[in-house]
Design a protein with these regions (language model features):
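Conserved beta-sheet core of the metallophosphoesterase superfamily
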Residues: 1-70
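A short C-terminal boundary segment appended to hydrolase-like catalytic domains
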Residues: 56-101
Length: 101
């Protein structure tokens, strides 16, 4: 949020990604910058950030390392749609999307 407020009015959008889980905090800031903390990921939805769940759960429970395998199936694509004014560069709308539902 701090970066969004700092850049408000200087950039069209501030979109983050790290946890791969889309946040429901999309908004237009006061000076015309669109903001969302985390857009989300594109990949297998029935997973832990794209990895098969079994090994991740085992590591979580035991603290022991293991080989992570990429998950397959139930693909989703997370995205954020930003509308902006071509003359000013300011955002006029923001909407989060999850395709494949």
């Amino acid at each position: 949020m701090a970066l969004g407020w700092y850049l408000d009015g200087r950039v069209t959008a501030v979109l983050g990604t790290h946890t791969h889980v889309p946040t429901a905090d999309e908004r237009l800031l006061h000076k015309g910058t669109a903001y969302q903390t985390d857009v989300g990921m594109s990949g297998p939805f029935d997973s832990v950030i794209g990895v098969e769940t079994e090994m991740v759960v085992q590591r979580f429970l035991t603290g022991m390392p293991g080989k992570f395998e990429a998950a397959k199936g139930n693909p989703k694509m997370c995205a954020t749609l930003i509308a902006c004014d071509g003359a000013t560069g300011r955002a006029t709308g923001i909407r989060r999307l999850m395709l494949g539902e």
